[in-house]
Amino acid sequence: MSTAPNKQSALKKITRGLTVGTVITGSTFFHGPPVLALGLTKLFKKSSKIDETNIQITNSWLGVNNWLIDHVLPNLKWDISIDEDLDLNMQGRYLMTCNHQSWVDTTVNQYFGLTRMPLTRFFTKWELIFIPFVGQAFKILGFPMMKRHTKEQIAKNPELKDRDMMEARKACEQLLSQPFTLLNYLEGTRFTQEKHD
């Protein structure tokens, strides 16, 4: 009995994984610093041109991710329907709702939205701010970043209940001066049968 096909398959998966990891890391280190640098300049001078440039850089960043999906994961099967009568454009303002099934949801929305509508921002956890470049880009690009508080924390400090709402309003006000797509996972967390029951 030969194990050659299994070794070849395992080697192919490892090579693909290394390729994806290398390209994503390289793209992050290429696109992340300019987004951060432009974001810092906004502290001193507000400018729609800075926002537009940051969006272009971010779309390029997402374009690299989409290239990976198309070329490194070519056997991927999509089962997605987009209403042909839906009139989307890059200058629009959209509110999108979605059931949060897995970490792939955001990738799929970014993949299909990249050339159809403005950059999709979504409500995200504050803890992601600590991911180098990515977390800071979320903040700079106007992604509403929510802190999760337990019932006990809110009971001790009732002001915490309204803090996320104020952060969401602030992020949404920042988006008003530009085209945007705001994605909200209404249940606020990934779906599991346990949470559903």
Regions found by a protein language model. Name each.
Residues 2-95, 108:
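Membrane-anchoring hydrophobic helices of lipid-metabolizing enzymes
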